[in-house]
Amino acid sequence: ETYVLSIVPSGPLKAEIAQRLEDVFAGKNTDLEALMEWLKTRPILSPLTKGILGFVFTLTVPSERGLQRRRFVQNALNGNGDPNNMDRAVKLYKKLKREITFHGAKEVALSYSTGALASCMGLIYNRMGTVTTEVAFGLVCATCEQIADSQHRSHRQMATITNPLIRHENRMVLASTTAKAMEQMAGSSEQAAEAMEVASQARQMVQAMRTIGTHPNSSTGLRDNLLENLQAYQNRMGVQMQRFK
């Protein structure tokens, strides 16, 4: 979720896509065809961003085995029709077949160009090759990191993520997740109203930041405040913080 959102331009559409992704990963959205139709008609997004989102939706939403592949995703993931990209994509695919973890796949993929990575996604999308879901997500995240890096014109560093756009998006995703956890924990306790209030404020903040677009550093405080509030609330409730670290 974090990586994919880091390549979507700020605006009302980003907030909408964030909600769709959240629903998809939570298993709430099970109509892949409707989701793809919605994605296809979104304005602003580049064909490649649509292709990556379509790939993620297809990986995550359970669907009928024979469901037709979508042309707009295939076209976006063909490596600009460059045969070099396709050659590299095949080499990368062979390496990915040997990987079993998300991090292993991401590490391998990061040494390839965006065109080769997109072509490799295309191979998997068109069912010309199969990898585990973990590995496919490693490929997606490597591609998004490269795109976000080129947008930020910063150099990738393998050990840690230094890209402020990705860190910013990660903090907002964390804030949303924490807000959701607070709402679930609130239940019928006396402090429920307070918890719901804090969670609701956090959601509104995240939505506003995604819609308006803010400086990547501006989300640090949001995440920290929310975690502080959650910790204080949990201490009063006598609940362990373990789940949300």
UniProtKB/Swiss-Prot annotation:
Where does the protein principally reside? virion
Q: Which Pfam families match?
A: Flu_M1, Flu_M1_C
Name the InterPro entries for this protein.
Flu_matrix_M1, Flu_matrix_M1_C, Flu_matrix_M1_N, Flu_matrix_M1_N_sub1, Flu_matrix_M1_N_sub2
TM segment ranges:
none
Q: Where in the cell is it found?
A: Virion membrane; Host nucleus
Might you report a single GO cellular component term? membrane
Locate the region Membrane-binding: 1-157
Keyword terms, alphabetized:
Host nucleus, Membrane, RNA-binding, Viral matrix protein, Virion
**How is this protein positioned relative to the membrane?**
Multi-pass membrane protein
Q: Which GO terms describe its molecular function?
A: RNA binding; structural constituent of virion
Q: Where is this region: RNP-binding?
A: 158-245
The superkingdom listed in its UniProt entry is Viruses
In chain numbering, motif Nuclear localization signal lies across 94-98
**What interactions and quaternary structure are annotated?**
Homodimer and homomultimer. Interacts with NEP. Binds ribonucleocapsid by both interacting with genomic RNA and NP protein. May interact with HA and NA. Cannot bind NP without genomic RNA.
Other remarks on record?
Answer: Most abundant protein in virion. When expressed alone can form virus-like particles in transfected cells.
Task: Give the family per the record.
Answer: Belongs to the influenza viruses Matrix protein M1 family.
Q: What does this protein do?
A: Plays critical roles in virus replication, from virus entry and uncoating to assembly and budding of the virus particle. M1 binding to ribonucleocapsids (RNPs) in nucleus seems to inhibit viral transcription. Interaction of viral NEP with M1-RNP is thought to promote nuclear export of the complex, which is targeted to the virion assembly site at the apical plasma membrane in polarized epithelial cells. Interactions with NA and HA may bring M1, a non-raft-associated protein, into lipid rafts. Forms a continuous shell on the inner side of the lipid bilayer in virion, where it binds the RNP. Determines the virion's shape: spherical or filamentous. Clinical isolates of influenza are characterized by the presence of significant proportion of filamentous virions, whereas after multiple passage on eggs or cell culture, virions have only spherical morphology. Filamentous virions are thought to be important to infect neighboring cells, and spherical virions more suited to spread through aerosol between hosts organisms.
Q: What's the name of the protein?
A: Matrix protein 1
